[in-house]
Amino acid sequence: MTEPSIVITGLALRLPGADDQEQFWKLLIEGEDRTRPVSRQRRALAGRPDWDDVIGEVEGIEMFDAEFFGIDEDEAVFMDPQHRMVMELAYEAVCDAGLLESKRTAERRYSVYMAMSTNPYYPLVSRHLDEHGPAGVHPRTIMNLHP
């Protein structure tokens, strides 16, 4: 009996200084370090004015097309930025693999595997949960809400 094949056919990413594969490879080849001192805005949002560190920040996290994903704008505002990015990246990975153009997509099984790091977003918005509900806010929900 033969084992089913596993093929990686699509890739999507968001990293500091790289929004796609080409930018990522360029950073690798050039050996560029995209970490920067924590910005004043980031320190203020975190409530840590004395935060003296370097971090790698992904740009454009506020650029989310809630309507495209069928999400109410009010809910999208409270969604963890990583959750919004997961939705975009899952879609981009499927597109990169050419699965949306395939007439056989419905006949096969596909998976999107992701990795993410922790972040302080949940504590920043948790006081608003009663008002807007928990969907898309708690980090444990991020990988579970996508068909």
Which residues make up each language-model segment?
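Cys-dependent condensing catalytic cores that perform Claisen condensation/acyl-transfer
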Residues: 1-147
